[in-house]
Every structure is written in C-alpha cells, then in structure tokens.
C-alpha cells in the first residue's frame, strides 16, 4: 500500500498536540540551522520535493512529500520517524495562507501564533504579509526542522518554532492565532474549543480557523461561534489528495 494512503488522515487524535513519545525533547528554533542536525537535514532534503504548484499559494515554496518522492509509494512503517503530517500542505492551511496573503492588514505589525503549524506555510504567509512576531507551534521536532528549511526556501529569516503541547500551558498574549485542519477528531476538537475560548476570554485575541468542511468540524458546536470570511475552490491536485474535498474556508471565531 502506498505510504501516502496510510497517513493522509492522522491516525491519532492527538498527533499534532501531544508529544511524539515520552522521551522526545522539546526544542525552540531561533536562528537558521541552529538546531538542524546535518544528517536529518540531508534526509529531509533527499526525501522531499521543493514545490509551489498544486496549491492555493504558488507564492510559497515548500518541502513536501509528492508523488515523485520515494516515500509517497512506500509502506508507512518504512518511514523511520513519527508520521510526517508536516509534509502535506493540508487544505485548511492553504485557505488560511491564501487569506493572509490576500489580506495583509490582518497580520501587518501583529504578533501571530500558528497552532499545529505543520509545514509552516501559514506562518510563512503571515511573515510575508508583515507580521511583527511569529511563533509556530507543532509537537513534532522534525516539523520544526522542516519549517526552518521552508523559511530559507522563501528567503525569510526563520521565526521561533516551539515543539511542545501548549494546550496544557499558559502562553503570553498574541494578537492573532491561526490554526488549520485541526478539527479532524471529536475529542481534539473539544479540547481545542475549550482552549481557544479561554484564551480569547483572557486576552481578547482574534482567532482564524481554516477547514475544508470535515464532518468533525461541520458538526461541532464551535460552528455556532464562527463567521465565514471566505471560501476557496481547491486546486485539482489538492482535491485528489484529500478524498475529493473541493473547497476550504476561513472562519473568524467569536465566542
């Protein structure tokens, strides 16, 4: 079975937000290459492809797994690290990134937290659009490395990447939180909803959510607190990679 078919949908409901395993270290990248293991960097470069096609944001180059990569076709268990969700440009993230690029005033001069950052595309879009401070968050240390590489691809100085579960910690104030494709499991959706509500009530922070209309999102109670800002038709390659999902939208959170 092709590797991509095994992990297109996360198997674990906590895959983005819980530690990869109990022994995983937590890293915070602050400068280009400061924590990039040379062997890991070489492995990622060998087994991903730099691409800007087939997405809503041709302005952004990313290292992704594509059909031209070996592990797109290999069995999932042959990939030697945690499941590489960061190596797919998910449709909710595409919509968020497109929206920020088209509406730079949303982030210009503001501090932004990209929750479940994955490949880092939305954080990169925020930086391109003039955000003054960015923190990308993903629990997978390899995602942190990939984000740093993707910053370099786009001519950006890297922003901090925090690789830990922040749902059980207190964070400083950000002007904007963005998250895409995080409502794929009911339990995770409940936890995110509670965390976002508490953060909003504490800090008054604006929250933007990108999602292609997965059932776990469309049927969740958070929908009663959301206002749709925009909906995009997904490019054909993204539709094919996501089981026929045809659109993706950006929502403004108003609890």
From Swiss-Prot:
GO MF entry, a single one: heat shock protein binding
GO biological process, one term: peptidyl-lysine trimethylation
InterPro entries tied to this protein: Ribosomal_L11_MeTrfase_PrmA (IPR050078), SAM-dependent_MTases_sf (IPR029063)
EC number(s) given by UniProt: 2.1.1.-
Assembly with partners or alone: Interacts with HSPD1; this protein may possibly be a methylation substrate.
Domain of life per record: Eukaryota
Function, as annotated: Protein-lysine methyltransferase that selectively trimethylates the flavoprotein ETFB in mitochondria. Thereby, may negatively regulate the function of ETFB in electron transfer from Acyl-CoA dehydrogenases.
Record-stated family: Belongs to the methyltransferase superfamily. ETFBKMT family.
Protein name: Electron transfer flavoprotein beta subunit lysine methyltransferase
Statement: the UniProt record of this protein carries the keyword S-adenosyl-L-methionine: no
Organism classification: Eukaryota, Metazoa, Chordata, Craniata, Vertebrata
Listed GO CC annotations: mitochondrial matrix; protein-containing complex
Segment annotated as transit peptide: 1-32
Keywords from the named record: Cytoplasm, Methyltransferase, Mitochondrion, Transferase, Transit peptide
Pfam families: PrmA
Protein's organism: Mus musculus
UniProt subcellular location: Cytoplasm; Mitochondrion matrix
Reactions accelerated catalytically: L-lysyl-[protein] + 3 S-adenosyl-L-methionine = N(6),N(6),N(6)-trimethyl-L-lysyl-[protein] + 3 S-adenosyl-L-homocysteine + 3 H(+)
């Amino acid at each position: 079975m092709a590797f991509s078919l095994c992990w297109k949908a996360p198997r674990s409901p906590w895959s983005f937000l819980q530690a990869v395993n109990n022994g995983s270290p937590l890293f915070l990248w602050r400068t280009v290459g400061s924590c990039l293991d040379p062997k890991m960097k070489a492995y990622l470069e060998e087994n991903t492809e730099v691409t800007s096609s087939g997405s809503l944001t041709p302005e952004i180059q990313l290292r992704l797994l594509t059909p031209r990569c070996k592990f797109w076709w290999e069995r999932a268990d042959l990939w030697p690290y945690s499941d590489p969700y960061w190596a797919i440009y998910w449709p909710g993230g595409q919509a968020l990134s497109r929206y920020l690029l088209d509406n730079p005033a949303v982030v210009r001069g503001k501090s932004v937290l990209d929750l479940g950052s994955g490949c880092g595309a939305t954080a990169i879009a925020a930086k391109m659009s003039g955000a003054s401070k960015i923190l990308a968050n993903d629990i997978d240390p390899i995602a942190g490395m990939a984000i740093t590489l993707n910053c370099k691809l786009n001519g950006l100085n890297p922003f901090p990447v925090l690789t830990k579960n922040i749902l059980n910690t207190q964070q400083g104030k950000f002007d904007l939180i963005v998250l895409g494709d995080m409502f794929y499991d009911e339990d995770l959706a409940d936890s995110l909803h509670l965390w976002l509500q508490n953060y909003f009530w504490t800090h008054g922070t604006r929250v933007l959510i990108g999602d292609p209309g997965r059932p776990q999102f469309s049927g969740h109670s958070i929908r009663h607190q959301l206002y749709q800002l925009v909906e995009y038709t997904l490019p054909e390659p993204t539709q094919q990679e996501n089981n026929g999902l045809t659109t993706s939208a950006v929502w403004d959170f108003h609890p």
